[in-house]
Regions:
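Mature, Sec-exported extracytoplasmic domains of Gram-positive
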Residues: 2-168
């Protein structure tokens, strides 16, 4: 009886993986943010399953970007003295922070996966190109799932109120 149960679990796990694989495959080349969000909502969001996939970024301006390109552009703008801000929304699921979308100067980018361990996000990002990091919202959405909103800026000493104003 226990063997039957184990077999059933293995079959279910395989089905979940195939389902994840198909959904991500369906998203390739898609441009409509609504379609992306709808497809993403079907994912079981198991980080182990998703680790095989690169970060895939789509903007609401219908262009594809990689996460690295986005950060490089932010860095270049910052070095040139242009005001630039980057907003990232992460949610915590099964103790893993998963990046769901980023906004850079008004353009929204949907990211299919991130791999940010809970508790290290602030330290990790401060080592990057940002002078200021504000965590302006952190709330439990569901049992075991939290949402965190982070604003990065190339200006120094940005208050949480200023960061919140930018988001509004």
């Amino acid at each position: 009886e226990q063997t039957d149960e184990q077999t059933q679990e293995a079959v279910q796990e395989a089905e979940n993986f195939v389902q994840t694989d198909n959904i991500l495959e369906n998203l390739k080349g898609k441009r409509d943010p609504e379609v992306i969000l709808q497809e993403m909502s079907k994912l079981p969001f198991n980080m182990e399953d998703l680790k095989a996939y690169p970060v895939y970024v789509l903007s609401d301006q219908f262009e594809e970007r990689s996460g690295a390109e986005l950060l490089t552009e932010f860095y270049e703008q910052s070095k040139q003295g242009n005001l630039a801000q980057l907003l990232m929304v992460n949610y915590c699921y099964n103790e893993k922070w998963i990046l769901s979308y980023a906004e850079f100067d008004g353009s929204t980018y949907y990211l299919l996966r991130g791999n940010i361990d809970a508790g290290t996000v602030e330290e990790d990002y401060k080592e990057m190109y940002f002078h200021s990091l504000n965590i302006i919202e952190k709330k439990e959405v569901d049992q075991g799932m939290s949402l965190i909103m982070i604003v990065f800026s190339n200006q120094e000493n940005v208050s949480d109120e200023q960061a919140e104003q930018y988001v509004k």
